[in-house]
Amino acid sequence: MKSVRYLIGLFAFIACYYLLPISTRLLWQPDETRYAEISREMLASGDWIVPHLLGLRYFEKPIAGYWINSIGQWLFGANNFGVRAGVIFATLLTAALVTWFTLRLWRDKRLALLAAVIYLSLFIVYAIGTYAVLDPFIAFWLVAGMCSFWLAMQAQTWKGKSAGFLLLGITCGMGVMTKGFLALAVPVLSVLPWVATQKRWKDLFIYGWLAVISCILTVLPWGLAIAQREPDFWHYFFWVEHIQRFAMDDAQHRAPFWYYLPVIIAGSLPWLGLLPGALYAGWQNRKHSATVYLLSWTIMPLLFFSVAKGKLPTYILSCFAPLAMLMAHYALLAAKNNPLALRINGWINIAFGVTGIIATFVVSPWGPMNTPVWQTFESYKVFCAWSIFSLWAFFGWYTLTNVEKTWPFAALCPLGLALLVGFSIPDRVMEGKHPQFFVEMTQESLQPSRYILTDSVGVAAGLAWSLQRDDIIMYRQTGELKYGLNYPDAKGRFVSGDEFANWLNQHRQEGIITLVLSVDRDEDINSLAIPSADVIDRQERLVLIQYRPK
């Protein structure tokens, strides 16, 4: 009966965090709108080989992540949940692997379940795992690779070892098809310390080639197909998206070496109090083969991405699966022997919740700020934000009431965040970051437009997805579409600021022309260097400018 209660509680937890509230959150630009539109175009065109964005070739990532996203929209429709269904599915599958692997290592069902709950409730896992980007997919393939390699090395027969290494190659191949060659570097770096300490080089050299073969065979069909259709894909993807993005001096998203330290700290909430102890206990217990393995998969990718010049918080998502397992193991030991870390964790959550309540008041209409985040008419959003932090503090307090038994309830600290964050986003943020909000406000003007131009790729993708059309024209800025716009068949998909007046004169009689511009909050739109318009509709950071036939 206790196992049944645990399972019911787990399903209720998943429903409240990962299913019920997802549709209440509008898509964020540029990431979610971009991936939503790429998958919509894939479904509309039936082209499952070459990724396109706004009808243009888009070579920033391989194809597998788009396949999964497309299946999500195919199953659930072109809506917020459909767009995020793929990443949610991948996150839940990763949690299932965490459960299975923990059970295999320690033969403890309660520990395995707690590891999954800790993983799913980690702030960084929840934030990225319900956000339509490709990182939850690559995290799943990396964690699957972690499990496969362990299976291979623990197998006692040549058949078992062969199967494990073949499975490892498939996971690496799917990782390559999701986000590129990092899916090869991370597993190699992660297993080497364990192989060295356990002196298992022989098995690696004898069976490792099976992983190489299965990886190549996994990638080969699509790799050849894309090379035949678009011969320059692999050159662009390897040199620009890998070498330049991560290693060159002009790498994208440059950040210092210590960049991931605050990410680890914030991402470990509401289990931050367990982080130092879990890592320290893992190091103390490094003679235990499984502990060394989990530590290696936690630390080595973190060091690798810290050394790389280009950094984003999403890159280290896979580190949190083995970390959650170490945290769960340490928490059960602490509950039995010395619950100090569990008490500290409770106080950290209380402090975080109280700090959030105070910060919400400071930036509210009733606080001391001259320009509050929320306006007076958004008071219900302020109360939603207060509720988020109040629930966080409450469950932090509850874990202290009988800490040896109640510490797992820290998993409910983000419950308010999961249920209410979609209702607490300020209008000033929505107007700039949620193109759906803009489309809802200007639907009647946008729908009949013959041409729509915009100066933001994220906004363009949001307009295209909401309006179900891929012919949005880039105005003045090319952004990440620069490479796709260089193709001869992309002529006419970009209009510079200097050319706009002439372009307008040539196309005005064909129908309504709509220009959607991103502007600063205090920018005077009357000073924009554009021809006089028939309609100007400003929605804070986005402006709709319309020209009708004359």
From Swiss-Prot:
Its main location: membrane. Catalyzes the transfer of the L-Ara4N moiety of the glycolipid undecaprenyl phosphate-alpha-L-Ara4N to lipid A. The modified arabinose is attached to lipid A and is required for resistance to polymyxin and cationic antimicrobial peptides. It comes from the Bacteria. It is found in: Cell inner membrane. One of its GO terms (biological process) is response to iron(III) ion. One of its GO terms (cellular component) is plasma membrane. It catalyses: 4-amino-4-deoxy-alpha-L-arabinopyranosyl di-trans,octa-cis-undecaprenyl phosphate + lipid IVA = lipid IIA + di-trans,octa-cis-undecaprenyl phosphate. GO terms for molecular function: 4-amino-4-deoxy-L-arabinose transferase activity; mannosyltransferase activity. It comes from Escherichia coli O127:H6 (strain E2348/69 / EPEC). HAMAP family: ArnT_transfer. Belongs to the glycosyltransferase 83 family. Pathway: Lipopolysaccharide metabolism; 4-amino-4-deoxy-beta-L-arabinose-lipid A biosynthesis. Keywords: Cell inner membrane, Cell membrane, Glycosyltransferase, Lipid A biosynthesis, Lipid biosynthesis, Lipid metabolism, Lipopolysaccharide biosynthesis, Membrane, Transferase, Transmembrane, Transmembrane helix. This is Undecaprenyl phosphate-alpha-4-amino-4-deoxy-L-arabinose arabinosyl transferase. InterPro entries: ArnT_tfrase (IPR022839), Glyco_trans_39/83 (IPR003342), LipidA_mod_glycosyltrf_83 (IPR050297). The keyword Thylakoid does not apply. The gene is arnT. It is a multi-pass membrane protein. The chain crosses the membrane at residues 7-27, 81-101, 113-133, 134-154, 165-185, 204-224, 263-283, 288-308, 315-335, 346-366, 382-402, 406-426. The keyword Transmembrane helix applies. It is an enzyme of class 2 (transferase). Its EC number is 2.4.2.43.
